[in-house]
Design a protein with these regions (language model features):
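Conserved beta-strand-loop-beta-strand hairpin that lines the nucleotide-binding pocket
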Residues: 2-6, 59-181
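Conserved polar catalytic motif of the HATPase_c/GHKL fold
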Residues: 52-57
Length: 181
């Protein structure tokens, strides 16, 4: 493990055929850079889940062209960024919400089931942080209401921080995942 901040860039062509080889490549870049004090198996499992979900998201939503992945690390953390261009995540335009009759412009429940509630928390107009809270059997909802945003939940639960930013000037969608060592 190097003591400096390091970065690897990877272009993914958004094809299902390249998902496994792309996942293996990115995990290979991460494997040798996990510091000795970190739980290597835990970090690699979380990275595998997160990267698989980000690659799948690119195939489903990024459209033509390619998606850029940046992997950055230092002695304290690992950052995985996925950047594509196009329309913003639909949540950017759904900020207004009412909770218990009171307007809550910064936090919105976007999905829930008996295990988890998933929230979008607006840091500003185009920047969303995701958070989840564990549910209980008392919170059980009918099957029709079970997680619509399961991929976002998977990444949120597997990371220490998960954010989304839409850059209007470049029409870029940036999904940023942080894992602490």
């Amino acid at each position: 493990m190097q003591n400096c901040a390091c970065n690897v860039e990877f272009q993914f062509d958004n094809s299902a055929e390249k998902l496994v080889s792309s996942l293996e490549y990115m995990l290979g870049q991460i494997t040798g850079n996990i510091p000795p004090h970190a739980d290597k198996d835990d970090i690699l499992f979380r990275c595998k889940v997160i990267i698989t979900e980000l690659l799948t998201n690119a195939i489903k939503h990024a459209g033509r062209g390619s998606t850029r992945f940046d992997i950055e690390w230092d002695a304290e953390k690992l950052i995985i960024c996925k950047t594509d261009t196009g329309m913003p995540l639909y949540l950017v335009n759904t900020r207004n919400n009412t909770t218990n009759g009171k307007a809550d412009l910064n936090k919105r429940l976007i999905s829930a089931d008996f295990l988890n509630s998933l929230y979008a928390i607006w840091e500003n107009e185009n920047h969303i942080r995701f958070a989840s809270e564990e549910g209980s059997l008392d919170d059980f909802r009918p099957v029709e209401q079970v997680m619509e945003h399961f991929g976002i939940l998977i990444i949120t639960r597997s990371s220490d921080e998960f954010t989304y930013t839409y850059d209007k000037a470049t029409r870029s969608n940036v999904f940023r995942v942080k894992i602490n060592f």
